[in-house]
């Protein structure tokens, strides 16, 4: 949004409806009666409807007398020879709702569909059965009615129009529920079209073909031409002509396909391709809403390949000079910049100058015509003009027109006006201009950042490596987009809000998004290791100059003979004290122990950002980057073939082989497939430990792995140790050939005792390394498992991207309000307290706690007190009441009082706990710091928390999917896109439905005895699944024997008596007489009793105690007790089971929890399941907001297109997601009003979104805009205007 007011009017709302024939005629300027595709009167391109071509932009419109560029276009109309039904579903709904004789609608406030064959309360007429037949075929779609004891009859559009015309306006107002007068915008008679509007030609412009430049008519123009042609043919025929029926069918087909041709019923006459109707133009990714309204192409943009540049600062972007000279920005002339602008004007870097009266001066290049004659001043010929731009440069050359022979007069040379304050100069980019850098796909906030321009030679866009993680750039040909903001407000927001220093802290999780990578991390690691050998003087001077430059530095900070670790410590803030983990600790800006890694550097940047702000963190990243670059230039580091070798290769190979053999023996002794997988995974882990221990300390690949700059120990193990077990689909490669007996034809069917290693190789165990080389069979298994990661990367990225888009569209209106609540566009409360704490997670050390109490206690204690025993210190606060005084009083004022009391108690408990665990000496300073930190961490009003939630979760899902590509052969866990997609959709039949049931049995009890105790009470199976052979109906003896499968029945502890009881309960005598045999059940029945039908339902008899559970596994829990993991869920049954520990029973089915325990329990369980999928390194506030959004309506609501259709926002916001035409049609048929409250609707209407800087408003008093009359003399005697109000003035809003 620009700072200055626009001359155009703002859209306040949109009224949807269906036009009546009278309204169509009133807005029409011409009746289209000719089917020719030429600019003729009455044709499809009648000039009175506006311009349609690309070459007549300067022609005047006969209707509005504007040029082709300014003419908005004017509608025409077609008088249809026969009525046409466009919206069949809505038409059938109204036919079911009203009486077909008198048109009366029921008296209910929201009438339902009357029962067919019932009598009308007004006239007593019978209501017929109305059906829509062949709804998906536009050639055969029709409405049928059936009277009682009659046959279905097709209801023609003429009869439909007559029936719906009887509906009274008052009934329409009552049915729509939009208040009195709604029938003005919609009446059911308008569902049958008798007069068709014709779009202006500017809405269906001609397209120029390439390469011949011929004009091609738009599909909609061809549709209109065909409709007009058929319509005129019908009018020309007599009503009783036999050809009329076929032409009417064509007219209705082409009219329907004009709106919706997704079935491709109407095709081009030349290329036989389906033509695009209105629905195809509006919906999908390339439609009008998403391609041209929600997102638009714009000027002042650039695109090029992106590359790294370690000399740039974090917030700088290197722009190629060719792009910088092409992009322009308007600048207001002031006394302070007039000299610099005049210099740019002389250098040719100004494109235009706008005077204060609005006149624009722009240089235009004059060129002679191609073929003009060139002569010297004395008349000597020089030939003809072949290169107009080059030949016009010499002013001494005389030009004569090749047409008339007359001398061509050159225009006078262009001269710029003298610059004065108030003018606007459009200049090229200079260093320091703000520009937005973006890389698609824009998954989260850090995919588009505001940078400072730095003009550089070359043709690639360059940026600092520290910001590449947010863009997900790997410089393998990635391209970046540059967007140049034009207005002063847009430039300020780009410079301040979008700056990388303002978004160093990730909006996704508690880590720094902008930090060192690769060479920078490696340099920090190596420098932190070197704490004894001093730097040479040249190296020391180079590093200090690179970091501090000409600003200078205090020589006392870096002593003579400083080591690389001292150099690294000199860059850190002197007040920094942080425990980086892994034995690395920094105290008072000095590295006192350990060494730096990538995670340690991120923790340092995060600590500096939280304590000193984003600017300080950005400067720290710059200094670390420049310091490591300079230091590595003196200490080269490269990896070679020798780094792939261990210190003693033969011994390493032997030790790895021994480890593999021992684990293979464990796999042989395993009872099930899970035990085999655990043993084989242990072989890879043992091989990794052996390989890493055999590497030399200075091995460069190991150094990079320990520094976390590139690679890890897993890669080293695959290179020098072994690849280990390969997995496909979460399990070992199966035996897929030779009837399921072999995995490859190279392996035998039966294994000898000496072929144990080969046996596991046939199931994908690779004991070779890349250094040794894989045999062809191992290569096959490795490629087979690696394919899974590749396919997952290529296919699941689209799945996760669509999931993110669904979350964004349904949560884009969720914004934090000024009262601390989270509300949607309609003002409905989604959360009373954001995240349960009301704090901005990016400003907190932990979830909802913005204070690092340990560091704060050290800072608020003297050095003498710190060195003494901790008993000399005392807690700064001693009670909850005292701690609650440090919480901001205005925290979440819109929440109910009980919620606020709980919130204050929660924060006070955290403060009290921090004070007790970390006592200090200066209590007043401690309290002041805590109060200031809490006040600064309160969530800002207008924060788009819904979009942040969706982007954070979506980016995390996408990153998890991309990571699978780099883990070829590893057992990929299923806590990823598929389960999370099921949670978003709240599938009632998820792929994995299980219950975890802890058992109340002695942990020392053997597993078989536990199964005996449980019996078949945990399962219920169909009788057919338990049979060894399916019997047929006996014809002799009237008996049947059901033979049970002993393996299945023993595993489930289902006895023949249980089967007999279940059969007898469903089919008691005289149906069957049931008796138990050795391991089966015998059925007998009466001789004259028919049992053929009974046998059909016999095999569906349920045997067991818990419906919905097929089987279960017994596992050991973390506490050593027995846990039953079931396949299938029935939470209610397990909560009541005497052997189940009901307090710890868990199920993965959210709907089962909702139906058993209610909404609160389902919400908590949904949060736990989502946290297990994506909660790692993610702010819990995002998941809490998403679960609250899904549970806000009082029942679980999925995140999908059906929920979007029932949202309370306007139809335009809903149509911007999916099913655009259906939603807009429904809005018109229900006379909805779009108030432009949702984010999507405001973007489509050209309004600022109510979030961020567009969230606040301005309240002014009545006299605010009055001319000030009070003049007060200043100290020098000059008068100035006093804009303040006096105390006795009345101030009214």
UniProtKB/Swiss-Prot annotation:
Chain positions recorded as Zn(2+) 1 binding sites: 61, 64, 71, 74
Keyword Metal-binding: yes
Chain sites annotated for binding Mg(2+) 2: 474, 476
GO biological process: DNA-templated transcription
Cellular component annotations (GO), alphabetically ordered: DNA-directed RNA polymerase complex
Function field: Component of the DNA-dependent RNA polymerase that catalyzes the transcription of DNA into RNA using the four ribonucleoside triphosphates as substrates. Largest and catalytic component of RNA polymerase II which synthesizes mRNA precursors and many functional non-coding RNAs. Forms the polymerase active center together with the second largest subunit.
Keyword Metal-binding: yes
PANTHER family per record: DNA-DIRECTED RNA POLYMERASE, DNA-DIRECTED RNA POLYMERASE II SUBUNIT RPB1
Originating species: Frog virus 3 (isolate Goorha) (FV-3)
Region Alpha-amanitin binding: start-end pairs: 724-734
Residues at which Mg(2+) 1 binds: 474, 476, 478
Residue positions binding Zn(2+) 2: 99, 102, 123
E.C. code: 2.7.7.6
Keywords of this entry: DNA-binding, DNA-directed RNA polymerase, Magnesium, Metal-binding, Nucleotidyltransferase, Transcription, Transferase, Zinc
Region (Disordered): 354-390
Residues covered by region (Bridging helix): 776-788
Pfam families with a match to the protein in the record: RNA_pol_Rpb1_1, RNA_pol_Rpb1_2, RNA_pol_Rpb1_3, RNA_pol_Rpb1_4, RNA_pol_Rpb1_5
Designated name of the protein: Putative DNA-directed RNA polymerase 008R
DNA bind region: 270-339
SMART domains in alphabetical order: RPOLA_N
């Amino acid at each position: 949004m620009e700072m200055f007011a626009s001359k155009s009017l703002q859209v306040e709302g949109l009224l949807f409806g269906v036009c009546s024939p009278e309204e169509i005629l009133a807005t029409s300027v011409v009746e289209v009666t000719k089917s020719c595709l030429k600019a003729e009167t009455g044709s499809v391109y009648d000039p009175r409807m506006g311009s349609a071509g690309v070459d007549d932009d300067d022609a005047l419109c006969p209707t509005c007398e504007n040029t082709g560029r300014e003419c908005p276009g004017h509608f025409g109309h077609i008088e249809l020879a026969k009525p046409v039904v466009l919206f069949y579903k809505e038409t059938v709904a109204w036919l079911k709702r009203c009486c077909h004789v008198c048109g009366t609608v029921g008296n209910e406030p929201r009438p339902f569909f009357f029962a067919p064959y019932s009598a009308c309360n007004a006239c007593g007429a019978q209501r017929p059965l109305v059906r829509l037949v062949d709804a998906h075929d536009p050639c055969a779609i029709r409405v049928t009615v059936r009277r009682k004891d009659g046959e279905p009859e097709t209801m023609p559009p003429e009869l439909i129009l007559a029936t719906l015309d009887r509906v009274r306006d008052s009934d329409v107002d009552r049915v729509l529920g939009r208040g009195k007068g709604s029938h003005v915008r919609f009446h059911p008679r308008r569902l049958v079209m008798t007069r068709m509007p014709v779009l202006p030609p500017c809405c269906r412009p001609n397209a120029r073909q390439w390469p011949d430049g011929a004009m091609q008519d738009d599909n909609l123009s061809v549709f209109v031409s065909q409709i007009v042609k058929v319509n005129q043919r019908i009018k020309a025929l007599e009503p009783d002509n036999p050809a009329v029926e076929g032409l009417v069918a064509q007219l209705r087909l082409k009219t329907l396909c004009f709106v919706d041709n997704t079935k491709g019923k109407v095709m081009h006459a030349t290329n036989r391709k389906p033509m695009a109707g209105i629905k195809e133009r509006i919906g999908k990714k390339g439609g009008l809403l998403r391609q041209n309204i929600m997102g638009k192409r714009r000027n002042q943009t650039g695109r090029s390949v992106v590359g790294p540049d370690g000399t740039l600062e974090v917030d700088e972007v290197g722009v190629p000079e060719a792009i910088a000279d092409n992009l322009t920005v308007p600048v207001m002339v002031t006394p302070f910049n007039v000299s610099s602008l005049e210099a740019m004007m002389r250098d040719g870097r100004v494109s235009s100058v706008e005077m204060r009266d609005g006149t624009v001066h722009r240089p235009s290049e004059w060129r002679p015509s191609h073929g003009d004659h060139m002569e010297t001043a004395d008349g000597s010929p020089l030939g003809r003009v072949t290169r107009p731009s080059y030949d016009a440069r010499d002013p001494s050359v005389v030009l004569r027109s090749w047409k008339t022979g007359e001398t061509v007069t050159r225009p006078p040379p262009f001269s710029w006006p003298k610059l004065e304050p108030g003018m606007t100069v459009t200049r090229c980019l200079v260093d320091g201009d703000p520009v937005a850098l973006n890389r698609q796909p824009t998954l989260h906030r850090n995919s588009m950042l505001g940078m400072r321009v730095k003009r550089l030679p070359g043709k690639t866009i360059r940026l600092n490596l520290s910001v590449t993680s947010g863009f997900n750039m790997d410089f393998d040909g990635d391209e970046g987009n540059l967007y140049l903001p034009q207005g002063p407000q847009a430039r300020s927001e780009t410079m301040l809000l979008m700056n990388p220093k303002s978004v160093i802290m990730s909006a996704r999780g508690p880590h720094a998004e902008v930090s060192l990578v690769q060479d920078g991390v490696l340099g920090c690691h190596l420098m932190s290791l070197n704490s004894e050998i001093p730097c040479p003087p040249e190296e020391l001077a180079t590093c200090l100059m690179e970091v501090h430059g000409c600003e200078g530095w205090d020589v006392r900070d870096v002593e003579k003979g400083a080591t690389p670790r001292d150099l690294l410590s000199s860059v850190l803030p002197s007040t920094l004290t942080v425990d980086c983990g892994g034995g690395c600790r920094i105290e008072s800006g000095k590295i006192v122990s350990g060494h730096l890694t990538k995670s340690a550097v991120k923790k340092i940047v995060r600590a500096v950002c939280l304590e000193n702000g984003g600017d300080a963190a950005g400067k720290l990243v710059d200094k670390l980057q420049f310091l490591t670059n300079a230091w590595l230039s003196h200490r080269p580091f490269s990896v070679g073939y020798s780094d792939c070798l261990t210190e003693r290769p033969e011994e390493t190979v032997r030790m790895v082989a021994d480890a593999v053999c021992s684990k293979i023996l464990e796999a042989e002794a395993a009872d099930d497939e899970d035990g085999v997988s655990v043993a084989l995974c242990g072989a890879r882990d043992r091989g990794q430990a052996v390989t890493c221990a055999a590497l030399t300390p200075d091995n460069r690949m190991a150094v990079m792995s320990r520094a976390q700059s590139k690679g890890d120990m897993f890669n080293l193990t695959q290179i020098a140790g072994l690849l280990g077990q390969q997995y496909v689909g979460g399990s070992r490669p199966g035996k897929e050939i030779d009837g399921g007996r072999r995995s490859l034809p190279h392996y035998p069917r039966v294994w000898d005792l000496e072929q144990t290693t080969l046996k596991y190789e046939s199931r994908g165990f690779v004991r070779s390394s890349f250094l040794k080389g894989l045999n062809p069979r191992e290569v096959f298994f490795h490629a087979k498992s690696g394919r899974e990661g590749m396919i997952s990367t290529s296919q699941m990225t689209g799945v996760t991207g669509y999931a993110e888009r669904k979350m964004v569209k349904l949560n884009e209106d969720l914004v934090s309000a000024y009262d601390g609540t989270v509300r949607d566009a309609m003002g409905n409360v989604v959360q009373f307290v954001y995240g349960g704490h009301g704090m901005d997670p990016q400003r907190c050390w932990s979830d909802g706690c913005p204070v690092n109490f340990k560091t704060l206690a050290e800072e608020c204690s003297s050095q003498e007190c710190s060195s003494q025993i901790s008993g000399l210190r005392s807690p700064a606060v001693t009670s909850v009441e005292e701690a609650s005084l440090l919480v901001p009083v205005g925290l979440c004022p819109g929440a109910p009082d009980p919620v606020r009391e709980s919130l204050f108690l929660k924060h006070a408990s955290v403060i009290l706990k921090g004070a007790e665990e970390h006592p200090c000496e200066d209590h007043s300073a401690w309290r002041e710091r805590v109060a200031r930190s809490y006040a600064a961490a309160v969530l800002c009003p207008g924060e788009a928390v819904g979009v942040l939630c969706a982007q954070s979760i979506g980016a995390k899902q996408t990153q998890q999917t991309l990571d699978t590509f780099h883990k070829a052969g590893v057992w990929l866990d299923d806590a990823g896109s598929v389960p999370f997609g099921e949670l978003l959709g709240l599938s009632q039949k998820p792929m994995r439905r299980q219950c975890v049931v802890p058992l109340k049995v002695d942990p020392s009890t053997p597993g078989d005895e536990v199964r005996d105790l449980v019996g078949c009470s945990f399962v219920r199976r169909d009788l057919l699944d338990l049979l060894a052979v399916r019997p047929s109906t006996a014809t002799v003896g009237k008996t049947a024997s059901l033979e049970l499968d002993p393996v299945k029945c023993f595993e489930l502890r289902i006895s023949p008596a249980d089967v007999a009881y279940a059969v007898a309960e469903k089919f008691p005598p005289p149906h069957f007489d049931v008796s138990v045999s050795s391991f089966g059940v015998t059925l007998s029945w009466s001789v004259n009793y028919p049992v053929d039908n009974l046998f059909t339902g016999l095999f569906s008899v349920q045997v067991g105690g818990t419906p919905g559970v097929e089987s279960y596994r017994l596992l050991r829990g973390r506490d050593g007790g027995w846990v039953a993991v079931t396949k299938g869920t029935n939470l209610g049954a397990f909560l009541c089971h005497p052997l189940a520990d009901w307090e710890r029973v868990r199920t993965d089915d959210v709907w089962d929890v909702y139906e058993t325990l209610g909404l609160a329990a389902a919400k908590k369980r949904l949060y736990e399941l989502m946290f297990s999928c994506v909660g790692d390194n993610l702010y819990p506030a995002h998941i809490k907001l998403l679960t609250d959004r899904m549970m806000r309506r009082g029942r679980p609501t999925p995140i999908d297109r059906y929920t979007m259709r029932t949202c309370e926002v306007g139809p335009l916001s809903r149509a911007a997601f999916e099913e655009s035409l259906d939603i807009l049609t429904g809005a018109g048929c229900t006379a909805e009003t779009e108030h432009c409250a949702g984010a999507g609707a405001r973007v489509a209407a050209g309004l600022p979104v109510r979030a961020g800087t567009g969230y606040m408003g301005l309240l002014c008093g009545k006299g605010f805009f009055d001319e000030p009359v009070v003049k007060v003399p200043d100290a020098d005697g000059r008068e100035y205007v006093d804009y303040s109000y006096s105390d006795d003035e009345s101030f009214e809003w």
